[in-house]
Amino acid sequence: MKRSGCVGLTIMICAGMLAGCGSSLEADTNTVYVSKHGKIVTMDVEQLDQSYYDETELKEFVDSAVEEYNTENGKNSVKVDDLTVEDGTAKLRMDYETVDDYTAFNGVELYEGKIVQALAAGYDFDTDFAGVDKDGSVTGVTRGDILAQEDLKVVIIKANTDVKIDGKILYVSCDNVTVTGKDSVSIKEGTGIEKTWITEAEEVPSTEAVLETESTEDAGDVIEGEVIIGTEEASGNDVVTNLSGGSSGTDVYTYIIYK
């Protein structure tokens, strides 16, 4: 069930409640935590106009939304773990029984499973990836390298938010992603991992940097070849994302592959 028709404060419910890792997590930014059993814990950090809302009013709204969802989807599908309002900042921590509950309640696409299962579900992994070393540095990796390890776990999300997983990150997609720890990433539009490596598919001897157009006279067909010899530089820190509105929507899928 996707919640809609939200104004002002209700953005906290509809635009995505961001996750933290476990009920004991204290996060200062929107974060989504995916546990090893597929349960989701979220922390949403929201700046409020205190002239409109206070802690009691906010709690009543959240409790009502949760009760409505659970009535339709089963008891304890979604639970409020903690809610505080201090100095104009609201922190809302919630528990979701399943990934599907998180997606249905927030309208934010989220997937968790093995790579082979994600492929069967229709995710194509058609993007640039980077390998994450023990020290947090990144290296080049191909899509084929990743798909060959189909039993690895993957979290796929379509949102601008921080994400933590219960495991060690091995690979991440490059667009809009910054690796912040062995088990965490930050997703913000305008940031990302700059691809400074060339994959095997892109490698071309220097004498062949430019391919000539070949024509086949008999068939009348023209075959054109194009070689990618570089990539555009990412804008990196030039773009700053305002997190005060919660997890904002995006058209980009972020892939986090781990064990």
Predicted regions and their residues:
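Positively charged n-region of N-terminal signal peptides that target proteins for export
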Residues: 1-12
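N-terminal Sec/ER secretory leader and immediately downstream segment
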Residues: 26-86
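Bacterial signal peptide processing site
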Residues: 22-24
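Mature, soluble, non-transmembrane domains
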Residues: 85-259
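Short linear motifs at secondary-structure transitions and domain/linker junctions
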Residues: 8-9, 65-71, 230-233
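C-terminal motif of bacterial Sec signal peptides marking the signal peptidase cleavage site
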Residues: 17-20
